[in-house]
Amino acid sequence: MPELLVFPAQTDLHEHPLYRAGHLILQDRASCLPAMLLDPRQAPMSWMPVPPQAIKTSHLAALLKNQGKIFAFDLDARRLASMATLLAWAGVSCCELAEEDFLAVSPLDPRYREVHYVLLDPSCSGSGMPSRQLEEPGAGTPSPVRLHALAGFQQRALCHALTFPSLQRLVYSMCSLCQEENEDMVQDALQQNPGAFRLAPALPARPHRGLSTFPGAEHCLRASPKTTLSGGFFVAVIERVEMPTSASQAKASAPERTPSPAPKRKKRAKSCSRCLHTALHIAEAPGSLLPGGKGRCLSSPWKTLGPHRRQQFAF
């Protein structure tokens, strides 16, 4: 990740002038993975981080070079106002904030029909966050009741995100170490959409993979304080399965039909063929990503956001 600077774990840069000026932002290295794995540099399309988080949204905007469109939703007006302030401080101008419930957003809404990428980071137990475990003893092992409630919301959010018609790639991320919130959620979503989506290998060179709970779980990625010297994190990259890219391919896979001799019927069939060709042509969005280093890191994504920003600094 060339936009990141890595520092020793105990480095305190909160008072550094570059940080205070908005040129740099403190971020756990593992939390940088979702935006990178979404691979937004492929094309300036429409993006949707759910729920909106200033750090991850800013990272997306930087990778997009402030192009395209990012939609972010939150029902809490105060959180949205705070996020708007932070995004403005970072120089982000391609994000549109909406005080809406993501689960109530219609995938057929003209505003969101062309959303191609979704970064889904719903509420979770936070069992992978070392700071929470220090502040709340026992936070690393949430109760079954709380896990069940969280998993229900995560399942609804993930399944809803997969219904957007133009979706090409979704990154599901959790700052949790619990299988119920991680591998189980991904397996359930794939089972509910058989043949429509698949897991893409996330940084296959990295040794720390998803738990072997279902075939393909090794494509998921895990991080933890013990294994990667970072916060605990889970990431899965879900891609839409490619459909035929031409009307002839689609016709070959469809049941054979006897054409009608009526001229009008022939004309309608030709028109439908053109529509089918357009609907089935889906652009690929392959990713080529490299693992980061060890330790705490400082993200400097805003160097690409405007002429008033500075280049990346090393210490």
From Swiss-Prot:
SUPFAM superfamilies: S-adenosyl-L-methionine-dependent methyltransferases
Active site annotation, chain numbering: 175
Region described as Disordered: 245-269
Residues annotated for S-adenosyl-L-methionine binding in this entry: 50-56, 74, 79, 121
Tissues expressing the protein: Ubiquitous.
Enzyme class (EC, first level): transferase
Taxonomy, superkingdom: Eukaryota
Pfam families attached to this UniProt entry: Methyltr_RsmB-F (PF01189), NSUN5_fdxn-like (PF21148)
Gene Ontology molecular-function annotations: RNA binding; RNA methyltransferase activity; S-adenosylmethionine-dependent methyltransferase activity
Keywords tagged on the record: Methyltransferase, RNA-binding, S-adenosyl-L-methionine, Transferase, Williams-Beuren syndrome
Enzyme Commission number(s) from the entry: 2.1.1.-
Keyword Nucleotide-binding: no
UniProt key word Transferase: yes
GO BP, sorted A to Z: RNA methylation; RNA processing
Coiled-coil regions listed in the entry: none
PANTHER family referenced in this protein's UniProt entry, alphabetically: 28S RRNA (CYTOSINE-C(5))-METHYLTRANSFERASE (PTHR22807:SF4), NOP2 YEAST -RELATED NOL1/NOP2/FMU SUN DOMAIN-CONTAINING (PTHR22807)
Known disease link: NSUN5C is located in the Williams-Beuren syndrome (WBS) critical region. WBS results from a hemizygous deletion of several genes on chromosome 7q11.23, thought to arise as a consequence of unequal crossing over between highly homologous low-copy repeat sequences flanking the deleted region.
Record function comment: May have S-adenosyl-L-methionine-dependent methyl-transferase activity.
Family: Belongs to the class I-like SAM-binding methyltransferase superfamily. RsmB/NOP family.
Listed name of the protein: Putative methyltransferase NSUN5C
Gene that this polypeptide is encoded by: NSUN5P2
